[in-house]
From Swiss-Prot:
Matches recorded under Gene3D superfamilies: RbsD-like domain
Organism of derivation: Pseudomonas fluorescens (strain Pf0-1)
GO cellular component: cytosol
Record-given protein name: D-ribose pyranase
Coiled-coil positions: none
Primary localization class, coarse: cytoplasm
Enzymatic reactions: beta-D-ribopyranose = beta-D-ribofuranose
Amino acid sequence: MKKTPLLNVALSRLIASLGHGDVVVIGDAGLPVPPGVELIDLALTHGVPDFVSTLKVVLSEMQVESHALAKEIFDKQPTALSTLDELNDEGSLGRRDLLSHEQFKVLSRQARAIVRTGECQPYCNIVLVAGVTF
């Protein structure tokens, strides 16, 4: 059995296969998945798993160069934003880009995969751009 926090097979496979610049989206339960983009559906029920816990586990294994958020998170999700700011201050998220929610959905078309959580708070979505460890 793995010793690291991430146990989901599909998510482990995805992270292990990422190259520099590849895009992964972690989204709430309502984020649309564009045709042709892989869906890794972790959602069990409302709030399980939640956005922040899922993000922290992904960050335990993924090197991130930059991330993007929808601007709406500032008004709608101050608690989630506070956690994202802490992770950003730790250096876990790299450069931050802010987009409209519509621009965010367009960018998600480039994702290698979208990870759907059970989060039911709006705008709890993030685009992660893979970095390198060297």
